[in-house]
Amino acid sequence: GVMIIGGECFYHCFTRPAESANGNTNCPHCQGKSPSGEVARLVNRVAAAVKKTGTHKALYAWPYSAWIWSSQDPAEVEWVSGLDANVSVMSNFDGYDENVGPGGGVRFFDYNITCIGPSTTFARQAAQCRKMNRPVFSKVETCTTPEAFFLPYLPLPQRWQARLEAMKATGVAGFIGQWRFFGMNASPPEELQYRAIWEKDSGKALETICRRDFLLDTDGVQETLAAWQMLSDAWEYFPYSAMTSGERAGYMRGPFYLGPAHPLIFDVQDSYNLPLSFRLLRGDAKEFASPEEFEELQRKAKPRYVSDLLVTLPFGLERYLELLRQCRSQWQAGRERLRSILSGRGERAERELGIVETIDSHLRTLENVVKFYQARDVLQNTACGSEEFRKRIEVLQKIATDEIANAERMLPVLEADPRIGYGYCYGPVYDAEMVRAKIAQCRFVRDEELP
């Protein structure tokens, strides 16, 4: 079994104590004791009990969000060192370091593919496990990330391959690779995963996929690999943050998540008669609520779209747009190169192009939403004459026109591939009807509200 012993799930006195931000607890018995030592002691007792029910049974302890109680042991090395041999350590491979790349200024949380890994925390835990002659296991994402649950996989094959090679080099004995353990989608990154597990040398896996799925010759294979590399390199500039992933909700909200279904809000007090699908709760809400509570939650649900610029935190508006434009520019170059190779190469090739096109559309929506709200706020908050006022209106209308075109181009993509927007983990993210509703809303803003 797997038990999360950090800040959720398997509760103990240090899980999330009230009014404590530094690892203390309000439990009179545990007050003043070492959180790492006490949590290790509890896990050891559970592991011993598990073994009594069958010596073949294994227990994996996962310190997910343990930063809540590990301020004095930030890499949880003391906790690892206190574990009995009956306990196996499983930890996040890519989390909790500060991004030192182009998108610097944020700390990696949960799962991403910007950081290949291992993180400092995982590397230190792995080193401690080696000292104790114990295996170390990891929890990673191997095909997509939380901000992109609208796709079965992110088409960044070299980044996924580098992650798997890094896991091998770090000595990872095994891993769980899907959010909520949802299973496999038969995606190219998952094939890389299988080959990395079962083949001693999986370095030619991408070439195999190109020849088999796209029926390419040697030159075509090399061109495809080069195009994929451009896409993988573009992701260095993706403005990764909790706000991009889901704004104040943390996950599953905002312009990158909803992409071509995300509206452009001019009047923040107007719901624009958008259908209920724009306010649906995330799919796991039913797991912790009774039917009556769920109905109440749904009635009070906030929109899944956003109407302000909090999404640009902590970068600030100008830096956010700079990163986004760099990411988009490189992505478009890779997309065009891939399109020149794969167009007309069969169903699998067309599906790959559709996935790449979808990311391009979501990045374009993200930029348009940020630019629209920036221009809207200038219009609403800065005095100007009538001529300047008209120019500002025209800027907003131009952005709306571009976003309408962006959404319209996604309709045939959605028609061709039901995986896009499906949301296999938490329920539908968006569909063609939501995109059409968004297009109608943007036309209303452009053609009626702004004039």
Q: Over which residues does each language-model region extend?
A:
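Substrate-binding groove of N-acetylhexosamine-processing glycoside hydrolases
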Residues: 30-451
